[in-house]
Amino acid sequence: MNFTRTRRLSFGVGLISLLSGSPLLADEELSLSFLDKNDFYLSSAGFKVQLANGPKGEKALHALPPHRFVIHTANGVSRYLFADPKRCICIFVGSKDNYLSYRSILSQPLGAAPNDVEADYKTNALTMLNAPMGGKDIYDPDSLSEFLQDYY
């Protein structure tokens, strides 16, 4: 009887740990080598690079979640934004077509990987295939419009 009680307690603690740790997995940082490749994929898909130099750029970069797609709409025009505060310190700006092209590039099978390719590449790629966030999640959307006015 004591064994059964201990087993239930262990299961309960394990389940709570698993459920409370799940949000942390979603925020797992992407590897630097994946981010290098990802910048190339974004550019190949037609995303334009807007360097976040200067006060407006820094404000816009910090208003976006790092390494996540966000759909931002201003003046009836929607743009897909991807902030990269680690590698290029920039925001990639593109259309829905650019985003779909990017997803197509990322979804293609890699084939045989050389030994120097990180084992977590597939996990990183799957993370990037998550649905983009809506613009309503951005803290101060006007700061983005001001910085990215060339794209609207």
Features from the language model and the residues they span:
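Bacterial N-terminal signal peptides that target proteins for export
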Residues: 2-12
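Mid-chain, structured segments of secreted extracytoplasmic proteins
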Residues: 67-111
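C-terminal partner/receptor-binding element of secreted or periplasmic proteins
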Residues: 33, 97-152
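N-terminal secretory signal peptides
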Residues: 26-75
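Bacterial N-terminal signal peptides
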Residues: 10-21
